[in-house]
């Protein structure tokens, strides 16, 4: 029986991975590894760190069934060595013919690697879109796109970013947006197809609380929260947010504008990428005989 081989690329530097481990319990790449293996035990994962110096110890990129790029604390427009290494890696990934997926930084990286542009948020009242992206709407193209299968046409979702896509590359189509930002794209570039989202469908409330704590000082500095205590209060409230949970009146302030009753906690776009892009591509590419069991 065949097993999918997915390469997970952590977008963070070594120092930032250590910071996430302190506040969340693990680096983002480990979160995605657990998510994929919990979804289906037939998935084999490898983790790579393209921001780090030195050669990447991976198979040829065309040997993988999928390449998944996590979020990151980095800013793609800064000419840091780790950023430049990741752009080069993403360009090679596009040339490999392997299906790609990116979350937050992962989407921004793909946009830049394919010739687009990402800059700091230009929205006056939203220097950092967190803890939620509200009012996300599927575009006419996105409403029929398999990446968003089972999504409602409008939704709220966990989010954490201070940069935005300002120019799309050729071959890119927006599949979701809200009033402030491009929220999801498909990019056909080189030999590969990329699906990506600006928001974080992989996070639980507990995970998002850890993200807030990890970036607490910067959230106060950029005006997203008034004090570190305000960040902590928000983190405590969001850590308890899960399907069916009742939000106390004192915590409602942290969920302003969020439809908590219809909030979708499943990582739909990632699972749809596996089912609707990775698996069909692998069957064509490697001549699979149908051994994959979908959940």
UniProtKB/Swiss-Prot annotation:
Pfam families recorded: GATase
Primary enzyme class: hydrolase
UniProt domain Glutamine amidotransferase type-1: residue ranges: 5-221
UniProt-annotated catalytic positions: 104, 200, 202
InterPro entries according to UniProt: ChyE-like, Class_I_gatase-like, GATASE
Extent of the signal sequence: none
Catalytic reactions of this protein: gamma-L-glutamyl-L-alaninol + H2O = L-alaninol + L-glutamate
Knockout or disruption consequences: Cells lacking this gene are unable to transform isopropylamine to L-alaninol.
GO molecular function, one term: hydrolase activity
Main function: Involved in the degradation of isopropylamine, which is a constituent of the herbicides atrazine. Catalyzes the hydrolysis of gamma-glutamyl-L-alaninol (GALO) to L-alaninol and L-glutamate. It can also uses gamma-glutamyl-isopropylamide, gamma-glutamyl-ethylamide, L-glutamine, and gamma-glutamyl-p-nitroanilide.
PANTHER family reported in the protein's UniProt record: GLUTAMINE AMIDOTRANSFERASE YLR126C-RELATED (PTHR42695:SF5)
Protein name as annotated: Gamma-glutamyl-L-1-hydroxyisopropylamide hydrolase
Species lineage: Bacteria, Pseudomonadati, Pseudomonadota, Gammaproteobacteria, Pseudomonadales
């Amino acid at each position: 029986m065949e097993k999918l081989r997915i390469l997970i690329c952590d977008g963070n530097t070594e120092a930032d991975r250590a910071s996430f481990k302190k506040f969340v319990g693990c680096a983002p790449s480990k979160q995605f590894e657990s998510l994929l293996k919990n979804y289906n035990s037939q998935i084999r994962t490898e983790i790579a760190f393209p921001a780090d110096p030195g050669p990447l110890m991976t198979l040829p990129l065309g040997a993988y069934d999928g390449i998944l790029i996590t979020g990151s604390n980095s800013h793609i427009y800064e000419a840091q060595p780790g950023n430049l290494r990741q752009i080069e890696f993403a360009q090679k990934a596009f040339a490999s013919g392997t299906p790609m997926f990116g979350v937050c930084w992962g989407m921004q990286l793909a946009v830049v690697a394919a010739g687009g542009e990402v800059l700091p948020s230009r929205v006056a009242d939203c220097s950092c879109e967190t803890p939620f992206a509200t009012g996300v709407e599927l575009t006419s193209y996105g409403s029929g796109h398999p990446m968003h299968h089972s999504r409602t046409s409008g939704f709220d979702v966990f989010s954490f970013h201070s940069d935005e896509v300002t120019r799309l590359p050729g071959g890119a189509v927006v599949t979701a947006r809200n009033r402030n930002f491009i929220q999801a794209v498909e990019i056909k570039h080189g030999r590969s197809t990329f699906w990506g989202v600006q928001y974080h469908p992989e996070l639980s409330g507990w995970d998002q609380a850890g993200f807030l704590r990890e970036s607490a000082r910067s959230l106060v500095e950029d005006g997203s929260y008034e004090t570190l205590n305000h960040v902590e209060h928000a983190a405590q409230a969001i850590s308890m947010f899960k399907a069916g949970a009742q939000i106390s009146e004192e915590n409602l302030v942290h969920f302003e504008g969020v439809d908590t009753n219809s909030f979708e906690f499943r990582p739909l776009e990632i699972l749809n990428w596996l089912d609707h892009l990775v698996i069909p591509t692998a069957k064509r590419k490697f001549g699979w005989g149908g051994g994959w069991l979908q959940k």
